[in-house]
Amino acid sequence: MSLAVRVIPCLDVDAGRVVKGVNFENLRDAGDPVELARRYNAAGADEITFLDVTASTSDRATTYDVVTRTAEEVFIPLTVGGGVRTVEDVDRLLRTGADKVSVNTAAVARPELITEITRRFGSQVLVLSLDARRTEDPGCASGYEVTTHGGRRGTGIDAVAWCREASERGVGEILLNSIDADGTREGFDLEMIRDVRAVTRVPLIASGGAGEPEHFPPAVAAGADAVLAASLFHFGPDDMLARVKDALRQAGHTVR
């Protein structure tokens, strides 16, 4: 595990605006992505993740102009994902200003994409973004299923097994998002974090369910190297980032 726990605001972007819903549905406007990125950068965020949440479902490319403007305002690592399908997409995003690129749907459809990207750019630029949900499907031994297209399509693929395979293919980080917990603000899915941590040494970013600063330390204790949230930061008090870091610090974790 890394020495310092990273705290990462997530900007889910639809048509140039930050949105947030519950369980990936009923999206509501949360503001301008460039302004929010600027605010979080000033407030002490360690990184920012930018996800074009409709790119994979509507078959359109990531909004490059928004990425460019965001990168100009942010002086911390910026991860960008949504609609990334090819090595060329990764190259363009890195040239646009992204420090890291996340893949989701396209990697599930063609796992070789992970290998191709890491061979060209290195593992450090690639984040596997995984939207997982609980399932009773006997084909998913862990009890978690990989979903694609913004959580709208089930795959029948075991989420923990997929994390193991992606790690073996060279992915640099795994962004582990619980669809069941997403937007509920009731806490992270600790069992899922523990199960994935048991099969990989790749850094894990816990996502989905944060509702108060006290939810973050248990995620780190379960095995997360970084913690990510959206609605808590978008709709919470201006000092929420500081509160989260204080909670982590008080629980004995190192933060920047």
UniProtKB/Swiss-Prot annotation:
**CDD domains the record matches:** HisF (cd04731)
Q: What are the disulphide bonds in this sequence?
A: none
Is the keyword Amino-acid biosynthesis assigned to this protein? yes
Which terms does the UniProt entry file under GO BP?
L-histidine biosynthetic process
Which InterPro entries does this chain map to?
Aldolase_TIM, His_biosynth, HisF, IGPS_HisA/HisF, RibuloseP-bd_barrel
Name its pathway. Amino-acid biosynthesis; L-histidine biosynthesis; L-histidine from 5-phospho-alpha-D-ribose 1-diphosphate: step 5/9
Signal peptide start-end: none
| Keywords tagged on the record | Amino-acid biosynthesis, Cytoplasm, Histidine biosynthesis, Lyase
- Return the GO cellular component terms, semicolon-separated: cytoplasm
Please name the SUPFAM superfamilies in this protein's record.
Answer: Ribulose-phoshate binding barrel
Question: Per its UniProt record, what Pfam families does this chain match?
Answer: His_biosynth (PF00977)
Single GO MF annotation: lyase activity
Q: Where in the cell is it found?
A: Cytoplasm
Q: Which PANTHER family match?
A: IMIDAZOLE GLYCEROL PHOSPHATE SYNTHASE HISHF, IMIDAZOLE GLYCEROL PHOSPHATE SYNTHASE SUBUNIT HISF/H IGP SYNTHASE SUBUNIT HISF/H
Q: Which family is this protein grouped under?
A: Belongs to the HisA/HisF family.
**Subunit composition?**
Heterodimer of HisH and HisF.
Role noted for this protein? IGPS catalyzes the conversion of PRFAR and glutamine to IGP, AICAR and glutamate. The HisF subunit catalyzes the cyclization activity that produces IGP and AICAR from PRFAR using the ammonia provided by the HisH subunit.
Q: State the name under which the record lists this protein.
A: Imidazole glycerol phosphate synthase subunit HisF
Native organism is Micrococcus luteus (strain ATCC 4698 / DSM 20030 / JCM 1464 / CCM 169 / CCUG 5858 / IAM 1056 / NBRC 3333 / NCIMB 9278 / NCTC 2665 / VKM Ac-2230)
What taxonomic classification does the UniProt entry list for its organism? Bacteria, Bacillati, Actinomycetota, Actinomycetes, Micrococcales
